[in-house]
Amino acid sequence: MADQEITLMKGNEAIAHAAIRCGCDGYFGYPITPQSEVLETLAVEKPWETTGMVVLQAESEVSSINMVYGGACTGKRVMTSSSSPGISLMQEGLSYMAGAELPALIVDVMRGGPGLGTIQPSQADYFQACKGGGHGDYHLIVLAPASVQEMADFVDLSFELAFRYRNPAMILADGAIGQMMEKVVLPPFKPRRTEEEIIKECPWATTGRMGRKHPNIITSLELRSEEMEVINLRIQKKYKEIEEKEVRFEEYLLDDAEYAIVAFGSAARIAKKSIEIARSQGIKVGLLRPIILWPFPTKEVQKLAGKVKGILSLEINAGQMVEDIRLAVEGKVPVQHFGRLGGIIPDPDEVVDAIKRLF
């Protein structure tokens, strides 16, 4: 496909094509519905014959994330993708990568749980993604696409943020976004970085370069408590910087809104239709969509609390993001949650009824 060509594809396919085009060096993954098309598309496209990108199906999600760890140590642009149960298996590796300050991209195309659950869409991985699902005090940078176009656009953005802050980044997409087909313009081809460029950009990397006075050693282990605290404080300082600089969100019809919906991913798309219906009935509703879930747009939610009569957290789960909204609002206005479970996506009319009932 030529640059700027409009094509029709699934969200998962857009992830794969964007990875090839944005200079990704390696993908290590394992098939699981509803994200298997990422690996399948890479296998069909055979980027190892064109860009030199490595594509490998590992024997498990545990192996996949540890391969990503190894690739990230060398300063390469590496990634994996999975769905909810598979992401659970990766949590140890993600904690290790955050502790070692390694940049990489993880894609989670969420399905319903708990346990094996269902293959239908869900947003129930919010806590796991945004609060650090593994052990220790760490965060991933979490991006939440709401369209196939954003699935494509967020691949390069995720890598840029991951390398800027030396931190794993996650694209958190629900199964509906992964499986839906839409028009998309793929990013232009970006060549993979040369070894010299990697050495310049990533002086911390274990590139195998000879002649260093002090070889790079990457680890998250430190047995001296005082030194471990210093490391933690440095990482927390980095998180504060991310919180100050990387909050991204979309506002929709909030100028005159009396009620606000906060939603991400496919739930935000539903919210826009619900707002159209509500406004046709004389109920002034607007939308705040977090584009990046962590860091969360706390200040923007706080501003909402001074403008509206109530806030509805629309999620395809039992209520997770609503906790961050309530923390931000500090009891200044009522905050309610509405969502569906078991892989069922809320209907726009249901959302309007919830606004009428809850407020």
Residue ranges, per PLM feature:
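Generic long, charged, amphipathic alpha-helical segments
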Residues: A271-L304
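N-terminal glycine-rich anion-binding loops that anchor highly charged ligand groups
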Residues: T7-V44
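Structural signature of the thiamine diphosphate
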Residues: L140-E197, E350-L358
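Conformationally flexible catalytic loops at phosphate/diphosphate-handling active centers
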Residues: R166-E251
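Thiamine diphosphate
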Residues: E37-K131, I141-F163
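Glycine-/acidic-rich phosphate or pyrophosphate-binding loops and their flanking alpha/beta elements
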Residues: K10-A14, Q236-Y259, K272
